[in-house]
Amino acid sequence: MAMGSGGGAGSEQEDTVLFRRGTGQSDDSDIWDDTALIKAYDKAVASFKHALKNGDMCETSDKPKGTARRKPAKKNKNQKKNATAPLKQWKAGDKCSAVWSEDGCVYPATITSVDLKRETCVVVYTGYGNKEEQNLSDLLSPTCEVANNTEQNTQENESQVSTDDSEHSSRSLRSKAHSKSKAAPWTSFLPPPPPVPGAGLGPGKPGLRFSGPPPPPPPPPPFLPCWMPPFPSGPPIIPPPPPISPDCLDDTDALGSMLISWYMSGYHTGYYMGFRQNKKEGKKCSHTN
């Protein structure tokens, strides 16, 4: 195929023929021969490399570099042969690892019989005695069972650690709540009551006249309008002690209740005397002015 240039230039440029049909080729020739396509591709690649080497992308070279001719890819059969790895030649008595069909886990086993025609075998699981028919292609090496057990143990240990951490945190929260519930009710600004004296004191001994449980502490005195304190607020009133169970009324409990009642009585008395003293000082200041 030829094309003439216009304008009477007389120059002709012959294009490269990529494919021509029915030009004397025999019927037995390979109709899928892509030699011309390979040559055209090699020519384009060579011209592109030459343009990159010269630093000019627009200039193309007519002389292609000598490049190796690519051969058609006809390695399908070889690739299939290489992809199919040969099976291991298992025989009776070999140690292996097999997947138990009931749970899908890998267990160590021993081959008892092999059927080469069916490519199957019968295995006995070590330590269990169960027999099962397995395909020879499904058998694993004994090291696979060890790796599987190691992974399972790691997962179990991680779950156990997370469970222990949650139990430890819940126990710490319960212990904190229990310690708070056992804390003494003396949370006001006043100090706690004095400690109980030694075992030398008790009902029926010198210095004590009470033989039974003391009466409940008196309520705090009501504040009259004329006794309102001049300062913004006074000390908070301590709560009464918890009631004593009748089953726990012994000498020590009775003595402790008596001392608590004395302490609260002195507290309310001092509180009242402070109001009186403050009132007297206020009257003196008013007379002086």
From Swiss-Prot:
The free-text function statement in the UniProt record for this protein reads: The SMN complex catalyzes the assembly of small nuclear ribonucleoproteins (snRNPs), the building blocks of the spliceosome, and thereby plays an important role in the splicing of cellular pre-mRNAs. Most spliceosomal snRNPs contain a common set of Sm proteins SNRPB, SNRPD1, SNRPD2, SNRPD3, SNRPE, SNRPF and SNRPG that assemble in a heptameric protein ring on the Sm site of the small nuclear RNA to form the core snRNP (Sm core).
InterPro entries, per database record: Smn1, SMN_C, SMN_G2-BD, SMN_Tudor, Tudor, Tudor_SMN_eumet
Q: Which domain of life is it from?
A: Eukaryota
Annotated localization: Nucleus, Gem; Nucleus, Cajal body; Cytoplasm; Cytoplasmic granule
Keyword rRNA-binding listed? The answer is no
The record's region (Disordered) falls at 1-27, 55-88, 150-226
Q: Which residues carry this modification: Phosphothreonine?
A: T23, T67
Q: Which UniProt keywords apply?
A: Cell projection, Cytoplasm, Isopeptide bond, mRNA processing, mRNA splicing, Neurogenesis, Nucleus, Phosphoprotein, RNA-binding, Ubl conjugation
Q: Where is the Tudor domain?
A: 89-149
Q: What is its main location?
A: nucleus
> Which intervals of the chain form a coiled coil?
none
Q: What is known of its domains?
A: The Tudor domain mediates association with dimethylarginines, which are common in snRNP proteins.
Q: Where is the composition biased (Basic residues)?
A: 66-80, 171-181
Q: Which CDD domains match?
A: SMN_C (cd22852), SMN_N (cd22851), Tudor_SMN (cd20398)
Q: Where is this region: P1 (binding site for GEMIN2)?
A: 11-42
**Under what name is this protein listed?**
Survival motor neuron protein
Record flagged with keyword RNA-binding: yes
| Organism, as annotated | Rattus norvegicus
Biased composition (Pro residues) is annotated at 212-226
Q: Which parts of the sequence are annotated with region: Required for interaction with RPP20/POP7?
A: 95-205
Q: How does it assemble?
A: Homooligomer; may form higher order homooligomers in the dimer to octamer range. Part of the core SMN complex that contains SMN1, GEMIN2/SIP1, DDX20/GEMIN3, GEMIN4, GEMIN5, GEMIN6, GEMIN7, GEMIN8 and STRAP/UNRIP. Part of the SMN-Sm complex that contains SMN1, GEMIN2/SIP1, DDX20/GEMIN3, GEMIN4, GEMIN5, GEMIN6, GEMIN7, GEMIN8, STRAP/UNRIP and the Sm proteins SNRPB, SNRPD1, SNRPD2, SNRPD3, SNRPE, SNRPF and SNRPG. Component of an import snRNP complex composed of KPNB1, RNUT1, SMN1 and ZNF259.
